[in-house]
Amino acid sequence: MTSTNIDNRVPIEKTIEVIVKNDKGEEVKVIKRYQEYQITVKRNRKVDERKKWKKFGECDNKTGLENTAYGDEQFLVLTRGAEVKEEEKDVVKCRICKKNHFTTKCPYKDALELTTQPQKSEKEEKPISNKYIAPNLRGGYTGSAPSGSDVPSIMVSNLSQNATEKDLYELFGQFGPVSRVSIPKSMEGSSKGFAYVTYNHLDSAEKALKQLNGHRYDYLVLSLEFAKKKSLN
């Protein structure tokens, strides 16, 4: 490390007399006065030792900066607004279809409300009468037909908008008798992309679920699952 210290408080004044010729050719004495400062220089001993090394090769006869080589000139380019994008974590999950959107925005919301809508029993609709009613005509009697909670209903997602109820009857009817097919429609009258298929028997619904889940239908792959709540309507 080399540093220089100048002490302005202790200048050394010196005078120089110089004889010069003016424009007329006459000799004139010029007196110059100046101040000399004491400068203290600290040098690095290791640097001074390296300067005494013997030069060789192409730098044998060169001195000073002549034997200093510079690398390629590099320009610094600063880009503004460069950010690394991180993968967005899915923090929103629908409670109906388990996909990444709010439950209120779920396209299957309307259809689920239809299947989960409670039905009025015959006891609520008909007033109580003192007249005798046969057991097979009394409210709540369904005979051998399954109750609403036992009806096997399948929700078919990722359905082509070109599919009709007739198409689904033919597709799902090969596994057993189908009692009902429902394709919810939008305000414009087009399919919402899913449907509900209700079987008469649970084993038929299980066969359809096993065979058609992941089945390619009209350039789409069907996704099947049992509806959370089954209804005859």
Swiss-Prot record:
What CDD domains is this protein classified in? RRM_eIF3G_like
* Protein keywords: Cytoplasm, Initiation factor, Protein biosynthesis, RNA-binding
Its Gene Ontology biological processes? Answer: formation of cytoplasmic translation initiation complex
One GO CC term, this protein: eukaryotic 48S preinitiation complex
Give any Pfam family that matches. Answer: RRM_1
Give compartment(s).
Cytoplasm
Q: Where does the record place the RRM domain?
A: 152-229
Task: Give the GO molecular function terms.
Answer: RNA binding; translation initiation factor activity
Quaternary structure, per UniProt, is:
Component of the eukaryotic translation initiation factor 3 (eIF-3) complex.
Q: What does this protein do?
A: RNA-binding component of the eukaryotic translation initiation factor 3 (eIF-3) complex, which is involved in protein synthesis of a specialized repertoire of mRNAs and, together with other initiation factors, stimulates binding of mRNA and methionyl-tRNAi to the 40S ribosome. The eIF-3 complex specifically targets and initiates translation of a subset of mRNAs involved in cell proliferation. This subunit can bind 18S rRNA.
Identify the PANTHER family for this entry.
EUKARYOTIC TRANSLATION INITIATION FACTOR 3 SUBUNIT G
Report the sequence similarity comment from the record: Belongs to the eIF-3 subunit G family.
The protein in question is named: Eukaryotic translation initiation factor 3 subunit G
